[in-house]
Amino acid sequence: MLDIKDLTFRYRAGRTAVFHNFSLHLEEGNIIGLLGKNGTGKSTLLYLIAGLLHPQQGKVLYKGIETQIRRPEVQEEMFIVPEEFELPNISLSRFVELNRPFYPKFSNDILEQALRDFELPVDLQLEALSMGQKKKVFMSFALATNTRLLLLDEPTNGLDIPSKTQFRRVISQHMTDERTVIISTHQVHDVETLIDRVLMLEGQRLLINDTTAHICEQLRFEQRPYGQDISDALYAEPSLAGTALITRGDGFQNTQIDLELLFNALTQHPDLLETPQNV
């Protein structure tokens, strides 16, 4: 579905490249967590995928078509929700009327259901909303477009705890086998139970492109009290409960993935996983 081939991108000539000879392949039907430190290019990658930024070298292909060309048949299949955005001072119904023609598969039913799940009315004025409410409305519209590729940049920023729970429920309810959702975030605990594939970026390179299921077959994520033996740990760090650690998995008794612990481990030990990319 999505292929990035030998991509190099920098914002200005002479500046350090955000990506250099970067390649990635993704199939459809996953909720993907795009993780990394601030400044590693998570948002940049989403904009490159959407065709809103152009690489100096290499290609970003959606079903074999370069996204930077912005052909209508590609644009109607993808939607991006930026971290920060402005909505016009109009009603939601007018916003839908103006924008739905660009998305042939748009569904009013999905829009209304998502708004209900976010506890928002269907008939509302966009200018009267808080930033968190605007984010919920825009994500509801994004889901209603029924695009095959949905790009979300820091979607839980500005949401309170109940709203983050609503977000996870809304995304999971409207997933299909044909849809791919890429969520860029540094708030990993907000999406830990939602995603089924992990992309981790670190210093112009891809640390990992793997499913959470495969990761949990290979690795166990544990908390042990102070003083307990951790000689079997592949990686360990102090935690409030004692020690957070990763041990080798047996493929049978899987544990819940700890994305923050995994990221910290992989930045120090990139070979921690046997097959870190494109599983």
Task: Give the residues covered by each predicted segment.
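A short, flexible loop at the N-terminus of ABC-type nucleotide-binding domains that lies
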Residues: 1-4, 8-21, 28
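The feature captures the beta-strand-to-loop junction immediately N-terminal to the Walker
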Residues: 35-37
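Helix-to-loop junction immediately C-terminal to a conserved catalytic motif
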Residues: 50
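Conserved ABC transporter NBD signature motif
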Residues: 58-69, 73-74
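ABC-family P-loop ATPase nucleotide-binding domains
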Residues: 80-137
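Catalytic Walker B motif of ABC-type/P-loop ATPase nucleotide-binding domains
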Residues: 150-154
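Short loop immediately C-terminal to the Walker-B catalytic DE motif
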Residues: 156-160
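ABC transporter nucleotide-binding domain
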Residues: 166-182, 186-247
